[in-house]
Amino acid sequence: MNQIDKKDIKQEVFDLYDDYAHNRLNRRSFMQKLSAYAVGGLTVPALMSFLMPDYEGNIQVKADDPRLKSAYINYSSAKGGGTIKGLLSQPKDAKGKLGGIIVVHENRGLNPYIEDVGRRAALAGFISLAPDALSPLGGYPGNDEAGRELQSKRDKGQMEEDFIAAFEYLKNHKDCNGKVGVVGFCFGGGIANMMAVRVPDLAAAVPFYGSQPALTDVPKIKAPLMLHYASLDTRITAGWPAYEAALKENGKKYQGFVYENVNHGFHNDTTPRYDKTAADLAWKRTVDFFGEQLK
């Protein structure tokens, strides 16, 4: 990121970026609307640069971290995209079998941020699998804009099957204890909710700012849930009260948190929407929750 100070950027700019990042605005319209905020020495290119992810400078756990075994694998998704690539990570010095975590990316494929989250989960003592739903189209293309375009071309139902197949792969992995949870971000948060509905033996689900399932599907949920929302993310968080009411009505085990004054994507430390305080707290809660549920 450059020298623009986050506190000097109006919330409307982050809202515009959210629309762009979720394909509700094309690039041309986004830049046109962004120009209204290019004042006081700010330029549209500078704002664009500020809002885009910075992967090189914000990786917490490097790909070659000596504490980990981390490598790409392929697994079969017969009902989905066929052969799916994913990053499998686990602690190098693990003694015994580990709880498993499926790490589900946003709406742009398996980018460096999500790979990093997979490695963070492994450092926390789990075996993690971060699949790439773009595998049938050649995989994550190296930038998020192209990744979003590719992901929009995939059939949603087939992508859901790809992540359910990832669950089966990890559950049966020789180094997994058979207890597998899922954590997902944005699109991945919606996938985590979907898996809670559709996978009866899922051990735990942690959606970060994910779209909620149909309320009529809530009775099907078996897994304990931990849900993280952002107060400024009005689009997604608006669905939380009704979802929570349905969880309560159906006697489901859940913990829900709404983090004040933070945006959708607050856990993603490669963009200016990142909020370290909220991200650190949400991640600690997540790791502790998985530690309890995946024993």
For the regions a language model picked out, list residue spans one by one:
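N-terminal cap/lid segment of alpha/beta-hydrolase-fold proteins
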Residues: 55-94
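Cap/lid segment of the alpha/beta-hydrolase catalytic domain
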Residues: 134-157, 265-270
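Alpha/beta-hydrolase active-site loop
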Residues: 149-173
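N-terminal export signals
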Residues: 18, 27-52
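Short beta-strand/loop motif that positions the catalytic acidic residue
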Residues: 227-229
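N-terminal secretory signal peptides
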Residues: 1-29
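Short beta-strand element of the alpha/beta-hydrolase
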Residues: 97-106
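Primarily recognizes the serine-hydrolase "nucleophile elbow" in alpha/beta-hydrolase
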Residues: 165-222
